[in-house]
């Protein structure tokens, strides 16, 4: 049942209340940004093409704020296609209207139109990011969100001498819209990108790239905070810096116990705050590669994939220790493309900080248990024009994906409006299953090919305050980065093989598990998360491999209003885009 409707005048009043609520006396501010979506020519790998950008920048502008601020972003669509923007990892308390996923919480912003997002920062502190949430547009429409501690507080680690956003991404020589259209027409997988990138540059190992390679100037003895974001569409990535170790101090804008490692593995959608100490041996090399390499779990002979390594250069510039030399040193500790043991060894070491200023509150009593199978499937081809369709699909079908054997179908109007106006009937069904409709054990398809699934717009409705445990159970042969809008969650467990309800919960970490918004579920394995459904609204959950979103590896949580005004969804803004 939807929330009661309020006229525009009451929305204006609610906006005043909202500003007061997020700007109390402790010094939080309202910050304003204008984003202009435009087509801009860029050249990479000797190819020039027109791409969608924000303010002509690729990556887009960085948003700077402090914990608890309100960020107002007016998005002007001067491009040639519909678009929306999502504020990835921002909980948006009571405010799904500004969350951004197309046809989930809003209709897209049409060319020539604009929409003003109210980005409510609450408990987030660290690095997040924003990106387009329509089609494959986020390949070039994305940027960092840097959230500093509240005034009067500081980092729970030594203050860095400098902060550096490091955005990992991908570049296609072809128009990204053509890449998506081709895959949908032919029913096959998406063509792999032509290069991985670091801050939109592939690095000097690629043609026509040497002069523009991203460089980081450092001085001996200084500490640098790298704000690392995986903005890629299709790949997990390993990241390392030659001659240096890295200390992870945060993930998804929540602090972690300091973890010093030789490399990190970061999934699409995830962010990590990493300290780099510039401590090289005197007289040694003064130039070092930072490198980002694809991590893939699929059999390498099954699909085309991007086997590239993006590079940037860390250069010591202080006169006492620096000496120009030949080529930069390469990070020999960077794991191989299919090193699953290295990936698991890294992610299982992450722990929440859990101090007095940043406590851990893991729910110990669970109200709603969900076991969600993740799978790659097929759907029948459109019987019309068979000569052109499904030429590249498996066994004459087209690729699909599912959660609990339901391949999500986006509605013609957004789910949030349908819920708000109590008109969900005919738009969505409230029967997303808590368990798989067809359970497969062992969690592989035994080489017989993908299984047929079914389409549906099924959502899961939760009472306000419900404690939810979701066990993601991966039936496929690749990892899946599962992202939940509107919440951070505790990753209480993970493992290989089939999840055992009688045995595996005993292995959970309920003391200091990492607090994330995106979790990498291991292939043919499982990951368990817990969260409290105390944010009323409509919230998307999906794989952050974008082709899997298009294929249907998604669902929606609807969290009902609580009893008090502070536990109820904000009213609908009067200027929402129309479908």
Curated annotation (Swiss-Prot):
Binding-site residues for Cu cation 2, renumbered to this chain: 88, 131, 544
GO molecular function, one term: oxidoreductase activity
SUPFAM superfamilies the UniProt entry points to: Cupredoxins
Stated name of the protein: Putative laccase-9
Principal place of residence: secreted
Binding annotation for Cu cation 1: 86, 483
Annotated Cu cation 3 binding sites: 133, 485, 542
Binding site for Cu cation 4: 480, 543, 548, 553
Gene field: LAC9
Stored InterPro entries: Cu-oxidase-like_N (IPR011707), Cu-oxidase_2nd (IPR001117), Cu-oxidase_C (IPR011706), Cu-oxidase_fam (IPR045087), Cu_oxidase_CS (IPR033138), Cu_oxidase_Cu_BS (IPR002355), Cupredoxin (IPR008972), CuRO_1_LCC (IPR034288)
């Amino acid at each position: 049942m939807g929330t009661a409707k309020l006229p525009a005048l009451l929305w204006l009043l609610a906006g005043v209340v909202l500003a007061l609520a997020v700007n109390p006396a402790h010094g939080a501010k309202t910050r304003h940004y204008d984003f202009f979506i435009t087509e801009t020519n860029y050249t990479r790998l000797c190819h020039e093409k027109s791409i969608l950008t924000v303010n002509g920048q690729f990556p887009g502008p960085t948003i700077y704020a402090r914990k608890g601020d309100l960020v107002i972003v007016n998005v002007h669509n001067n491009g040639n296609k519909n678009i929306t923007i999502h504020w990835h990892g921002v909980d948006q308390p009571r405010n799904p209207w500004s969350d951004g996923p197309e046809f989930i919480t809003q209709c897209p912003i049409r060319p020539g139109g604009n929409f003003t997002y109210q980005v409510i920062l609450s408990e987030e502190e660290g690095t997040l990011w924003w990106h387009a949430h329509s089609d494959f547009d986020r390949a070039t429409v994305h940027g960092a969100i840097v959230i500093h501690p509240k005034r009067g507080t500081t980092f729970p680690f030594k203050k860095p001498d400098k902060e550096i956003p490091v955005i990992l991404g991908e570049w296609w020589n072809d128009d990204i819209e053509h890449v998506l259209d081709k895959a949908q027409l032919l029913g096959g997988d998406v063509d792999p990108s032509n290069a991985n990138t670091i801050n939109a540059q592939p690095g000097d190992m690629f043609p026509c790239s040497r002069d523009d390679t991203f460089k980081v100037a450092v001085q001996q003895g200084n500490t640098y905070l790298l704000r690392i974001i995986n903005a890629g569409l299709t790949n997990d990535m390993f990241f390392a810096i030659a001659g240096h170790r890295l200390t992870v101090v945060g993930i998804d804008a929540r602090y972690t116990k300091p973890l010093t490692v030789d490399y990190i593995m970061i999934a699409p959608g995830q962010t990590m705050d990493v300290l780099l100490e510039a401590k090289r041996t005197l007289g040694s090399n003064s130039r070092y590669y930072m490198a980002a390499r694809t991590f893939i779990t699929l059999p390498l002979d099954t699909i085309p994939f991007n086997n590239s390594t993006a590079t940037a250069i860390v250069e010591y510039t202080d006169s006492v220790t620096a000496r120009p030399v030949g080529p930069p040193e390469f990070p020999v500790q960077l794991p191989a493309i299919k090193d699953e043991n290295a990936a698991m060894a890294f992610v299982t070491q992450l722990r929440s900080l859990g101090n007095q200023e940043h406590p851990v509150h893991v729910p110990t009593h669970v109200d709603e248990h969900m076991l969600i199978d993740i799978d790659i499937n097929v759907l029948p081809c459109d019987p019309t024009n068979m000569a052109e369709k499904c030429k590249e699909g498996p066994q004459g079908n087209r690729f699909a994906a599912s959660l609990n054997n339901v391949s999500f179908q986006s509605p013609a109007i957004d789910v949030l409006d349908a819920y708000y106006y109590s008109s969900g009937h005919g738009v969505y069904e409230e029967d997303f299953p808590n368990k798989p409709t067809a359970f497969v054990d062992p969690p592989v398809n035994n080489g017989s090919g993908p299984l047929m699934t079914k389409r549906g717009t099924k959502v899961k409705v939760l009472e306000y305050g419900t404690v939810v445990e979701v066990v993601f159970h991966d039936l496929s042969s690749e990892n899946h980065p599962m992202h939940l809008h509107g919440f951070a969650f505790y990753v209480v467990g993970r493992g290989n093989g089939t999840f055992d309800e009688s045995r595996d919960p005993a292995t959970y970490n309920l003391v200091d598990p990492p607090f994330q918004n995106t979790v990498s579920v291991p292939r043919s394995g499982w990951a368990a998360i817990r969260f409290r459904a105390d944010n009323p609204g409509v919230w998307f959950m999906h794989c952050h491999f974008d082709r899997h979103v298009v294929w249907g590896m998604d669902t929606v949580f609807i969290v009902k209003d609580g009893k008090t005004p502070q536990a109820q969804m904000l009213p609908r803004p009067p200027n929402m885009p129309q479908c």
